[in-house]
Amino acid sequence: SDNNASSGGAGDPWILGTTDTVTALDPAGSYDLGSSTLEYNLYQTLVTVPPNSTEIVGDAAKSCTYDDPTTLTCKLNPGEKFSNGDALTSADVKYSFERAIKIQDANGAAIYLLGSITDTAKDGTVTLNKGAIETPDDTTVVFHLDHPDTTFQYVLTYPGAAAIVDQDVFPADKKLADDQIIGSGPYKLSQYKAGDQAVLELNPNYTGPNTGKAPQVFVKYYTEPSALKLAVQNGEVDVAWRSLAPTDVASLKKDSNVTVATGKGSEIRYWVWNLNSGIGKQAAVRQAAAQIIDRDAIAKDAYDGTVDPLNSIVPPGYGGANEAFKTQYGAPNPAKAKQILKAAGISTPVNITVGWTPTHYGPSTEDEANEFQRQLESSGLFKVTLKSTEWEQYQTIYKQGAYDMWILGWFPDYPDGDDYLSPFMVDGGFFANGYHNAQVNKLVAQEQGTDDQAKRQQIFGQLQDIAAKDVPFIPTWVGQNTAVYGKGMSGVESTLDPSFIFRFWLVTKSG
């Protein structure tokens, strides 16, 4: 009953420390990890993904099922309420999508992730398709998609695109102030000061499957990783999560007062080839570089072993992930690379300009760029000119052909292999690198158009194999999901998975 939830709470309040920043706590205005960390705990989505899984389960909805590849019907749990006692009905669900699309915040996710139910005009204005969301009764929501898209169910797990808000509290045409927000998640917001701290307490009206244990959770925000390291060492915070420097993690492993826990990650780094340039256009050049790269050395020398080598663009832990680059190229082998270039009649050394950005992905990016250059040049087959540019300009000029090759990173929007394939491989990808392959486009349309997961995963494998042969990019590493915690804490390990959802409801403190 409701009474159990309100009197619930096991053990003591605990404190999370992080260097992540929050853009907004109104889901209509955020598309970043710092914001979604709080949103996952304060709001419900229709469906969600349990720890260490990519299987979708109900959250506010009992179920969301495809009637056909363009129709998704969601059945809400009866009697749902927001933390203020208001009933949560299908009307609130519809309103949540309508307002996010109407507000169209530049920092929001709705305009990027809800393409299956929206239309984009030439001037960039996004509107909800007529009849896209129907509510035949208080507990039923039907989505009509404008093309077959089985990834839409995964988008529904992400609060930035699909958190359910109270239509009587959130304005239709502008964002609500952060400290005013109301949700229906396991916790409710009791205090918030941007850049300083958030205070969450148990939501007494929560009836879902993820009832919180701790009566209160505090989130403290730090600007420097070094300050976060000190805070967890001296007990100022109970858990430090995102982001400690690789050297700090290494030294904390030697501190007996804290535990360093790691789970599978999903953040990746990869180098993109420019197929519009005379050099990058040549498949043999791209393949030769792929034959030389030593991922183990990059992980060890540039990142102190705090990341894992990545042998395909889809990381381990995702259905359908393989090790296509390892299968295709085996161990790093400059002699084989020389043969590839010789067979194609390409004279060596090949001169390439390689771009990287110094702050956006952290200080170790420079170490990776230098290691990348060292490996390619020590083969005797490449002459590498490194060029560094700050992020603001970098993301414009890499699309304009400034480099033959450049580094990028990726965090997934939803826990499905498609999110590492379609944005990267269809018609030049979001990074506009000039790669086009008709077979790729056909395969992506096939996997997005079926709900048969075995078939989709088989296609994911084919796409990864094509990527390893064509080499439009070279993946280098996948991050770990790392947290450091003090004495008396339990449950931290169980939330460290590739989704990067920090599930406050799983964590307790005693003593």
Whereabouts are the PLM-identified features?
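Structural transition elements
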Residues: 308-344, 360-367
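A structural "hinge/loop" feature
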Residues: 18-39, 60-62, 86, 150-162, ...
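Surface-exposed binding/hinge segments that line
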Residues: 65, 73-75, 94, 109-165
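N-terminal lobe/hinge region of extracytoplasmic solute-binding protein
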Residues: 17-68, 98, 182-183
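Alpha-helical secondary-structure segments
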Residues: 88-98, 138-144, 185-186, 214-216, ...
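Detector for C-terminal structural segments
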Residues: 293-321, 364-373, 395-511
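Gly/Pro-rich hinge or "lid" segments in bacterial periplasmic/extracellular proteins
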Residues: 148-212, 216
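Ligand-site clamp/hinge motif
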Residues: 175, 181, 204-250
